[in-house]
Curated annotation (Swiss-Prot):
Record function comment: Required for maturation of ribosomal RNAs and formation of the large ribosomal subunit.
Keyword rRNA processing: yes
Primary location group: nucleus
InterPro entries: BRCT_dom (IPR001357), BRCT_dom_sf (IPR036420), PES (IPR010613)
GO CC annotations, alphabetized: nucleolus; nucleoplasm; PeBoW complex; preribosome, large subunit precursor
UniProt protein name: Pescadillo homolog
Biased composition (Basic residues): 540-549
Family: Belongs to the pescadillo family.
Organism: Drosophila sechellia
Biased composition range(s): Acidic residues: 454-469, 497-521
């Protein structure tokens, strides 16, 4: 039997270096990177790097050998090789100035088809939805770029078209759930086919080119090349799921004959599609409001998990109310307010919206419409105001969506200091620090109900205690009266007769009195016991030695650390580091909160002092004038 050589089996054969992979595939480094991005192959980190590198100690980029074998059978490899041949022949034609042959070659430029790769990487539609977050974020970013060196204008236009189509689906399906404004952009979260899809839309600022090449636009452009094909497939499937025509089209009522539509119908339609303010054409010819079916709780409770089912039903009812949150409201967006995010929000929840026609095409009514209920303004003052509408700041729309109810508008008027904009993506169960504003907004109605019920229970307990006290007082008074009567008869009544000289009938009466006294004693004891049960006793102060408590916690932690298995020590240390970082973050947030509150308190005190000084000065001036 032949003795096996070293590094011929095990971890050494499971990994392959990037240089060896390039030799195996016969590709350049740029083509290999492009192929790996399109196929979803990425470098791996071995458990024992020295073994995986066959004894070498230098740091190399390693891939799974199975992944490289998987790339060998890909048809794109041949297309990438054809690129080299095309580049050589086209450069030769350009050098000898054979432009006729060069034109013919450019018409036969080899194109990469990625349809089969999308189907291969995402076997089911749900798999594609799970990986839609990065796709949407990157395409929304590229849709804002102008024509750059490595980003052609056609690619940016394609990203813009696909993202607008996806937003039309979100509006038509009313699947938007959460929104948030941050320094990075606008966060949106939609629920599609039971999957939560979150993406970021950047702020609408002018593009500023960077002098330093810190971002590799070439690699990002390869990702965009794959994601555009993927989102195209996804939009097609989503539109047909709602019986919407794809590509998006308008009903004949929208395309009325006008000078603008007759001049260039294609640009007219594309502008109206980008406006996100019109209903799309449906293939079923019937437009009905999709209503969720009521759940038969009697049948579902037989499963033995009624609490979970009731919670699901409550969540479904909240979502159904959220879908019609802005129904019956008409909004008007001022020219200084970002148009597209607010149009997405308002139309996703059943509202109507318009803007100045000079800003963008697709407005349906002007500012003078008397039926407008809310006008969104982001300036300190406005010259002309209507009494029939509320002038609010844009944050009101976002906060209403996150709270799933229409909030009072008095805190969002023009010139008002806005309340904190809380993130809906925070998990209250995982995060230990919760701002007081969020605690107040969690469920104020439930808090009031609890307070009211506690007051009622306290009143009832107080009434019961008063009743018991009155009964005890009556029993004690009756007992005292009986004792006084017995003593009076014992030591002499009004006739001067002693107890020893009384008749036998008096003895019988005394025995009856003794029995009554015993009954009263028992009743008094019982009432006193009941009072002791319901009465509040003064508590005792137990002094806690913080040093001993801290020492006990440290000892317990050390004992846990010693009990951890050696193979789980790294995981244990990681969990401890995460816990310490969370505690540190919570401490910093609380410290920041205290600093802000102290500064606000000092500012209020200063303002009060200034007001008093001004009032005193005004009073002194008035007194001088009076004299």
């Amino acid at each position: 039997m032949r003795r096996p050589k070293k590094y011929e089996s095990g971890e050494a054969t499971q990994y392959i270096s990037r240089r060896a992979a390039l030799r195996k595939l016969q590709l350049s480094l740029n083509d290999f990177r492009r192929l790996c991005i399109l196929k979803g192959v990425y470098p791996r980190e071995p458990k024992h790097r020295r073994r995986a590198q066959k004894g070498s100690s230098e740091i190399k980029v390693l891939y799974h050998t199975k992944d490289i074998r998987f790339l060998l059978h890909e048809s794109i490899v041949w297309t990438l090789r054809d690129y080299k041949i095309f580049a050589k022949k086209s450069n030769r034609d350009r050098a000898i100035k054979d432009f006729r042959n060069l034109k013919r070659r450019l018409a036969l430029f080899p194109e990469i088809k990625l349809d089969h790769i999308v189907k291969e990487r995402y076997p089911t539609f749900i798999d594609a939805l799970k990986d839609l977050d990065d796709c949407l974020t990157l395409l929304f970013l590229f849709s804002t770029f102008p024509s750059l060196h490595l980003i052609p204008r056609e690619q940016s236009n394609l990203c813009r078209r696909l993202t607008i189509e996806f937003l039309h689906y979100v509006i038509a399906s009313k699947s938007l759930r959460k929104v948030f404004i941050s320094i990075k952009g606008y966060y949106f979260q939609a629920e599609i086919k039971g999957q939560k899809v979150t993406w970021i839309v950047p702020h609408y600022y002018p593009f500023k080119p960077q002098s330093r090449q810190e971002v590799d636009f070439k690699v990002m452009s390869i990702f965009v090349e794959f994601y555009t094909i993927m989102l195209g497939f996804t939009n097609f499937r989503l539109f047909h799921g709602l019986n919407l025509a794809y590509p998006p089209q308008f009903p004949s009522s929208v395309l009325q004959d006008s000078e603008e539509s007759l001049k260039d119908e294609a640009s007219f339609v594309s502008d109206r599609i980008a406006a996100l303010n019109f209903e799309l054409l449906r293939t079923d010819k019937v437009q009905e409001d999709e209503e969720e079916l009521d759940i038969d709780m009697e049948l579902l409770e037989q499963d033995g998990d009624s609490k979970r089912i009731i919670k699901m039903k409550q969540e479904a009812q909240e979502v159904s109310r959220l879908r019609t949150l802005f129904k019956g409201l008409k909004f008007f967006i001022n020219r200084e307010v970002p148009r597209e995010p607010l149009v997405i929000l308002i139309r996703s929840f059943g509202g109507k919206v318009s803007w100045d026609s000079s800003i963008f095409a697709g407005s349906t009514y002007d500012e003078g419409d008397e039926t407008i209920t809310h006008q969104i303004v982001d300036r300190p003052s406005i010259s002309t105001q209507y009494i029939s509408r509320d002038y609010i700041q844009p944050q009101w729309v976002f906060d209403c969506v996150n709270q799933r109810q229409l909030l009072p508008t008095n805190k969002y008027f023009i010139g008002e200091t806005l309340p904190p904009h809380l993130s809906p993506f925070v998990d209250s169960k995982r995060d230990s620090y919760i701002p007081p504003e969020e605690k107040a907004l969690l469920d104020p109605s439930l808090i009031e109900t609890h307070v009211q019920s506690d007051d009622d229970s306290e009143d009832e307990a107080q009434e019961e205690e008063e009743t018991v006290d009155q009964e005890l007082l009556d029993a004690q008074l009756q007992l005292a009266y009986q004792q006084e009567t017995a003593e009076y008869k014992k030591f002499g009544g009004p006739d001067g007769v002693n107890e020893d000289e009384e008749d036998p009938e008096d003895d019988d009466d005394n025995e009856d009195d003794d029995e009554e006294e015993e009954e009263l004693d028992e009743k008094t004891k019982r009432l006193q016991e009941e009072k002791q049960k319901m009465s509040v006793q003064s508590g005792k102060v137990h002094k806690v030695n913080k040093r001993q408590v801290h020492k006990a916690e440290v000892d317990e932690h050390r004992l846990q650390a010693r009990m951890v298995k050696p193979r789980h020590r790294n995981l244990f240390r990681k969990l401890i580091r995460e816990k310490q970082s969370k505690e540190k973050e919570e401490w910093l947030l609380r410290k920041k909160r205290r600093t802000i509150e102290a500064s606000e308190k000092e500012a209020r005190k200063t303002a009060k002092r200034e007001a008093r000084k001004e009032a005193a000065a005004a009073a002194a001036k008035a007194s001088k004038l009076g004299k």
